[in-house]
Curated annotation (Swiss-Prot):
Record-annotated site: Lowers pKa of active site Cys: 141
Any one of the GO BP annotations: protein modification process
Family of the protein in this entry: Belongs to the LipB family.
Name of this protein: Octanoyltransferase
Chain sites annotated for binding substrate: 75-82, 144-146, 157-159
Organism: Desulfotalea psychrophila (strain LSv54 / DSM 12343)
BPL/LPL catalytic domain location: 30-214
Reaction it catalyzes: octanoyl-[ACP] + L-lysyl-[protein] = N(6)-octanoyl-L-lysyl-[protein] + holo-[ACP] + H(+)
Function, in words: Catalyzes the transfer of endogenously produced octanoic acid from octanoyl-acyl-carrier-protein onto the lipoyl domains of lipoate-dependent enzymes. Lipoyl-ACP can also act as a substrate although octanoyl-ACP is likely to be the physiological substrate.
Entry annotation: catalytic residues: 175 (acyl-thioester intermediate)
Lineage: superkingdom: Bacteria
Additional free-text comment from the UniProt record: In the reaction, the free carboxyl group of octanoic acid is attached via an amide linkage to the epsilon-amino group of a specific lysine residue of lipoyl domains of lipoate-dependent enzymes.
Length: 223
């Protein structure tokens, strides 16, 4: 059975290193189960394989002043923002063993966020040209997806804006798209949410779409 670890608030670099270690174990067969990492990051911009630094509209001096790092990684896509108030899920799944196509997998990530928003009274939709989930008018993005695949094993995942401070999104073209704004579940619903309550619902949806899993306290307990 798969397992899930709630890492709590973790730096992006530390969590990235954790992903790399788990992916290596899953690829080698040392780890024979799929894994979900649930976390939240301090403010950080990440750049995907297509780069995206040209979509950053804030000086390096201002970034340093605000304590926001910029990290280049191998996921798909361009620039995005992570920060407090997001739900970030990194599924490390052996797609090959699951006989799951990448397009099917991305669709399930989108469906996870669509159902999560709906459970709290907010309707969001897919965009056929851009991965992630959006408001019905297609102008605002509430959830971003960026993944990578190594030897049939997925990593990275999605970031869903819950009670997120949206100002840092205004300093970039999110995912390299002009004319797009970011929104959050709190903004769309007009109220803040208890993260613990939303997490509980998220775990239920993940189990429904990807199969049952056990929740473990730490990766150290997983053999």
């Amino acid at each position: 059975m798969s397992f899930l670890v709630d890492l709590g608030a973790t730096s992006y670099i530390a969590c990235y290193a954790t992903q790399q270690a788990v992916v290596a174990r899953r690829c080698s067969g040392d780890l024979d189960r799929d894994c979900f990492l649930l976390t939240e990051h301090p403010p950080v911009y990440t750049l995907g394989k297509r780069g995206g630094e040209q979509h950053l509209h804030i000086s390096k001096e201002m970034l340093a002043q605000k304590g926001i790092d910029v990290v280049s990684i191998e996921r798909g896509g361009e620039i995005t923002y992570h920060g407090p108030g997001q739900l970030v899920l990194y599924p490390i799944l052996h797609l090959r063993k699951r006989k799951m196509r990448v397009t099917e997998y991305v669709g399930l990530l989108e469906e996870t966020m669509i159902r999560l928003a709906a459970d709290f009274g907010v309707r969001v939709v897919r965009n056929t040209r851009n991965a992630g989930v959006w408001t019905e008018d297609g102008r605002s993005k509430i959830g971003s997806i960026g993944i990578a695949i190594r030897h049939g094993v997925s990593f990275h995942g999605f970031a869903f804006n819950l009670n997120t401070d949206l100002e840092p999104f205004s300093w970039i073209n999110p995912c390299g798209l002009t004319g797009v704004t970011a929104t959050s579940l709190a903004r769309e619903a007009g109220t803040d949410f208890d993260p613990a309550e939303v997490k509980k619902r998220l775990l239920s949806i993940v189990a429904d779409l990807f199969g049952e899993f056990t929740v473990v306290d730490s990766l150290h307990s997983v053999k």
